[in-house]
């Protein structure tokens, strides 16, 4: 998440940047995978966090990338965007399987970089360059929480995979966009290690100052008071920061669910052919055609 000209950031390649909000200082804001390849978005209920993710999906859907959804609220947030998703999982068990596949893909892509003697996806020749993958996690706490001892092994696999991806996957074009209400040590082992790798930060209205500190104190401590004072009657307002220490107050434009669904359908042809994601490809509901004029002509009444 970075501001455009006027906020001190350098230009990014257009193919990897998309409009995601409005900067309070310049009126322009763009998020970019190459500038902030791993990101964390925090916010309380009704803070605008879901609207922010909608805008991310709307922008990313128009780019040549694979979109992967992890929505453990049974898909209520992301299932509608299935026409543009290469993969969607809605339970922690399936999330563990999907993340394991992504780690295996990461290792395979590193082998590809090694064979070509380069260190970054974008240094590869275009004809062999893999498609970037963006993983959108709707509520990260659901991946950390366990209800019984038998869930501990699954949690360990999920957390280990997320940390490995966050630490290394930028170079091979796998990116994480993680959302949650809180994200700190109270989630358990591995949470703070993962958070440290998610260098792009966006914090909406939160329920306590500690949550704002979780999201901003390690990258832009001066932004914590601004995030703590976002009022309830300003949903969509947030503070965006990055490791440079710079930050800006932003406002996510209101975007309807139907608008994002329409964009996902329009750009469904951009879904790349990635066999490793095929087992997780969501079922796309048929589009219901709009009702047309009635073909039944009324008959005149006669006595």
Curated annotation (Swiss-Prot):
InterPro entries: FtsK/SpoIIIE/SftA, FtsK_dom, P-loop_NTPase
Gene3D superfamilies on file: P-loop containing nucleotide triphosphate hydrolases (3.40.50.300)
Positions contributing to ATP binding: 43-50
GO molecular function, one term: DNA binding
Domain FtsK: start-end pairs: 26-213
Keywords: ATP-binding, Nucleotide-binding, Plasmid
Pfam family, one: FtsK_SpoIIIE
Leader peptide range in chain numbering: none
Protein's UniProt keywords contain Secreted: no
Tagged with keyword ATP-binding: yes
PANTHER family: DNA TRANSLOCASE FTSK (PTHR22683:SF41), SPORULATION PROTEIN RELATED (PTHR22683)
Function in brief: Involved in sporulation inhibition and pock formation.
Protein name: Sporulation regulatory protein
Lineage, uppermost ranks: Bacteria, Bacillati, Actinomycetota, Actinomycetes, Kitasatosporales
